[in-house]
Amino acid sequence: MRFVGIDIAAETHVLAVVDDTGTVLVKPTSFTEDAAGYDRLLTVLGAPADTLVALEATGHYWKNLFATLAARGFAIALLNPLRTRRFAQEDLERTKTDTIDALGIARFAAQKRPAPARLPDPATEELRELVRLRDRLVQDFGDRVRQLHRLVDLGFPEFTRYVRSLDSELATAILHDYPTAAAFQGVSVARLARLRYDGRHTVGPDLARQLVEAAKVSVGRHHGEAYRIQVRFACEDLDLLRRRLRALTGDIERLLRQHEVGTLLTSIDGIGPQTAARLVAELGDPAQFRDAAALAAYVGVIPATRQSGKHRATRAGLTPIGHAALRAALWMPTLTAVRKNPWLRAYYERLRARGKLPKVALVAAMRKLLIAVYAVAKHRRPFVPHLVPQETRA
């Protein structure tokens, strides 16, 4: 059996090959991230029989290489870089060089025999890319809202007394045309009242009058052109991001309708299209896990609470180990599912009746929701309570 270790970089990779005993069969050899480099790699490796290729899952650089090797029939394992670094340190290879990493990865594979991985199907990969793009847009949107808050606090701090949400279309429409308190000078109430902010609604006379009067006595009136430009740019960015998020949400939902598991997950009350897409993006097929408990452990939702004497833990059931982003994404769907799913609501209420704190009971409900996710994926059927393990139902 041959074990190939490949250290991944942006432009040049390094490979090394060892046998079952760790004896070096191919000394560390570099190859480039292009067609010529891949040809060199395949020439060195030869036939894929009795060969395990091990790669560190570093950023996105491994994906083209993985696809090329998989198409040639190689078994490929994706490794956590932290595990390979720890292995190298234990092997007294403490000097960080690409050559040592390639050999260390190969020897790690020879000793640990990691299971081969596989790329997700194209539909899952597309959902994953779009969900993560949406995450970035949401982050950008939040950044712009925070920037706008800072600017409004300086240029027209009284504005948020009348328009609470600066991320709303109402706020960005007004602030784009009237970015600071000084910009309201000479503006009539009637003109401001006619301003449309979503194609249908107008500001209205009451709000217009309040803003015009507040601007006259605002403590931010001294701010000038620099603030006006920044506010306008922030509003334009928010409008653009809002349109992109709407379009992207529609794209994700259309893709989800073509995804078998993703569509089935929406049959669970509380799991809408965006949550189902998130589950598919982060988990692939939930049925790939050994059982529902393994899925819950991967997410980082544990079944028991820690108690000592009279102390009752308020964060029981959550562990820092696991998928924090997925846990956060499941919080609101769990609240919805507790309201809409009779079996989950009964389970939650039973825990509360036993004296469990609301947060502890909700974490337990999240775990049961994940068990339902696993059952739907495993049976490839829409959600029905009797397919969920007995412990999940009240």
What do the PLM-derived regions correspond to, one by one?
Residues 1-394:
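A detector of single, family-specific signature residues
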